């Protein structure tokens, strides 16, 4: 996968990778005070990206195949799940489906 940064913990079932935009958004969101919420969401995704809590939304349109979870009222963590590779690719986490 090009333009992707990896992050994995030893006992996690799923590997988290970031697009360039996803990593840029992560840094921006951390600086804006959402670090704890994002760490919590990433922990859920590492264990099972289809866990029903916190709730996720299956996206349509230009983002068909992607999912989102709420960071707060304005911002969403948007990701794609690659089942065979057990990878969760973070697309964005700033704004509402940017």
Model regions: which residues?
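Active-site rim helix/loop that mediates acceptor-substrate recognition in acyltransferases
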Residues: 63
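Enriched for short, Lys/Arg-rich terminal
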Residues: 1-27, 32-39, 53, 60, ...
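Blade/loop signatures of beta-propeller domains
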Residues: 47-49
């Amino acid at each position: 996968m090009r333009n992707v940064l990896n992050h994995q913990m030893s006992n996690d079932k799923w590997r988290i990778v970031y697009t360039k935009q996803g990593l840029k958004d992560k840094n921006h969101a951390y600086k804006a005070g959402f670090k704890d919420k994002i760490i919590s969401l990433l922990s859920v995704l590492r264990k099972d990206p289809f866990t029903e809590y916190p709730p996720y939304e299956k996206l349509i349109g230009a983002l068909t195949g992607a999912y989102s979870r709420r960071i707060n009222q304005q911002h969403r963590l948007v990701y794609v799940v690659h089942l065979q590779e057990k990878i969760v690719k973070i697309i964005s986490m700033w704004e509402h489906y940017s």
